[in-house]
Regions:
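Solvent-exposed loop and beta-edge segments used for protein-protein assembly and interaction
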Residues: 313-315, 341-343, 363-367, 387, ...
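Hydrophobic residues positioned within well-ordered beta-strands of beta-sheet architectures
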Residues: 301-303, 319, 347-349, 371, ...
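Single conserved hydrophobic/aromatic residue that forms the stacking wall/gate
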Residues: 3-4, 8, 423-432
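Intrinsically disordered, low-complexity Pro/Gly/Ser/Thr-rich segments with frequent PxxP/GP/PP motifs
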Residues: 328-364
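Terminal connector regions
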Residues: 357-401
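Low-complexity, Pro/Ser/Thr- and charge-rich linker/hinge segments at domain boundaries
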Residues: 2-5, 9-12, 393-414
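Acidic glycine/proline-rich low-complexity segments
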Residues: 178, 218-220, 232-233, 237, ...
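Extended substrate-binding grooves/exosites of carbohydrate-active enzymes
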Residues: 2-5, 9-300, 304, 308-315, ...
């Protein structure tokens, strides 16, 4: 660790990760090699660089594929006792009933699990961090589990989030790890606690039409050096293949089996669909926020390339600038870029019509011009063909008409599941004022 940061070859790492359960809609927890390979390839294509195995060691094939394709891993031990400590936190049972807590009767079995986790996966270079387990509060037994990992492997870091609820054994985790903390509270914690690097082991819960505010977290990696990314909850919808009354297959969730009570579709919180394991629309947001090259349009007549890759120069990629008018491509040009890792460089916008000093061409004042600068693979890779887009930035050039606000107040209406804003649009006569 350098300056309380996690580093690889002395370069600060940012985890652009996902939590991934072992799940198939056809075979349950027994996932095939083909399904795992599709997951890995999809992750690589969408700029995901890390997996947290939640909340148990996965089948060995995924460790092999992460080694081969180049994904980092938090390898998690098989432990979660959510029910025991959750009840204690709410006061319904005494805290001394928490498992494993400080009950040393549990320690031999827990240390055996740690040893098994380590011995099986110790030779996988993809594994950067060992995780003691998930959501099991704190206590002496869990601290001893972390110490067992360190005794077995003095080179890797140890992770555990549960000390967030029990600070008696802070040394259990080598990093501060939290779940679903707001951006403002992350900033507040970093300002007040400077002892460790910080990750979100679970964040941007991907249920329903979600991930829209994800950038508020990923932007933090640029402004808070000790904030080093997070792991989306979670990767794939946990749905089960079922036939409807017409014999047609569909992906079923809670309640589709006539069971009550149920959590309904609460297990459908992935960025990939169950079944075919294809990306859902949420993946577009993930890919953009996780991209390792940023393109900014903050300087007149120029665009800025920010290379966030730890080891790759931008000359490994084709840089293509595309000019569109009202959605129709009118010009396209390749640009040679050479931006070293963790560096920034400005380039001239190649289309004169978009520059303020353009004297030869006149923009159509009513048209919308769009400049898109993208970076694409030059060569075929094991996970994508040449031409696959790894990053892009875009700016829209359009004259925006003045907005005429209503003079009448906006009324807020609170429904059972929605909040509505009601207002009266200004009349044409009002707009002429």
């Amino acid at each position: 660790r350098r300056q309380r940061q996690m580093c690889i070859r002395d370069r600060r790492i940012v985890f652009k990760g996902v939590n991934r359960h072992e799940f198939s809609s056809k075979t349950g927890r027994a996932v095939t090699r083909e399904e795992v390979l599709k997951d890995i390839v999809t992750m690589k294509q969408n700029n995901i660089n890390a997996i947290r195995t939640c909340h148990y060691p996965d089948a060995s094939i995924i460790y092999d594929l992460c080694d081969e394709y180049g994904l980092y891993m938090i390898a998690e031990n098989n432990l979660e006792s959510h029910g025991s400590w959750d009840a204690a936190m709410h006061g319904s049972v005494p805290k001394d009933t928490i498992v494993p807590g400080d009950n040393m009767d549990w320690e031999p079995m827990m240390l055996d699990r740690v040893n098994s986790c380590y011995q099986r996966d110790k030779n996988h270079p993809a594994v950067l961090i060992w995780s003691v387990g998930n959501e099991s509060y704190g206590g002496k037994v869990i601290f001893d589990m972390s110490e067992k990992f360190r005794a077995l492997d003095p080179y890797r870091l140890v992770h555990y989030e549960g000390i967030f609820n029990d600070r008696r054994y802070e040394a259990t985790s080598d990093m501060e790890s939290q779940m679903y903390t707001s951006v403002e509270n992350v900033k507040k914690f970093l300002a007040e606690h400077k002892e460790k690097p910080f990750i979100m082991c679970e964040y941007t819960h991907a249920m329903g039409n979600s991930c829209g505010a994800m950038h508020k977290y990923t932007d933090l990696t640029d402004t808070e050096p000790r904030y080093q990314g997070g792991f989306i909850w979670d990767y794939i919808d946990q749905s089960i293949l079922k036939k409807d009354r017409y014999g047609k297959d569909f992906q079923a969730y809670g309640g589709d089996f006539l069971e009550r009570p149920t959590d309904y579709n609460f297990s459908g919180n992935g960025i990939c669909y169950g079944g075919d394991r294809d990306p859902s629309p949420k993946m577009q947001e993930v890919k953009f926020n996780y991209q390792n090259i940023s393109i900014l349009f903050e300087k007149e007549g120029k665009f800025t390339v920010v290379n966030k890759n730890l080891f790759a120069n931008t000359d490994r990629f084709r840089c293509v600038a595309v000019l569109q008018k009202n959605g129709v491509v009118v010009k396209k040009q390749e640009i040679e870029t050479t931006v070293p890792p963790l560096s920034t460089k400005d380039y001239e916008i190649p289309f004169a019509i978009l520059r303020a000093d353009d004297k030869d061409q006149k923009k159509d004042p009513d048209a919308e011009y769009t400049l898109t600068v993208s970076f694409r693979l030059k060569e075929d890779m094991s996970w994508a063909d040449a031409g696959h887009e790894v990053a892009f930035g875009q700016k829209i050039y359009k004259k925006i008409p003045a907005f005429h606000a209503s003079e009448k107040p906006i009324r807020v209406v609170h429904g059972k599941v929605n909040i509505c804003l009601l207002y009266t649009s200004p009349s044409p006569r009002d707009m002429r004022r």
